């Protein structure tokens, strides 16, 4: 999977906590942040208008479904 670079501004406290976690888990900060973002996106639901039986209704869908619908 291709990776892109993202720049974040974090508080000193967040960096300290991230560094402690990095040392404890023996993985890079990037790996921890990537995992956190992926978990966050998995939990998110987005309301999308979908046609069902000739009428529109709101339906919550996950990120993957939203991206799939956007491509169609």
From Swiss-Prot:
It comes from the Bacteria. Signal peptide: none annotated. CDD domains: RHH_CopG_NikR-like. GO terms for biological process: regulation of DNA-templated transcription. Residues 55-72 have a biased composition (Basic and acidic residues). Pfam families: RHH_1. Residues 52-72 are annotated as: Disordered. Belongs to the YiiE family. This is Uncharacterized protein YiiE. It comes from Escherichia coli O6:H1 (strain CFT073 / ATCC 700928 / UPEC). The lineage of its organism: Bacteria, Pseudomonadati, Pseudomonadota, Gammaproteobacteria, Enterobacterales. The gene is yiiE.
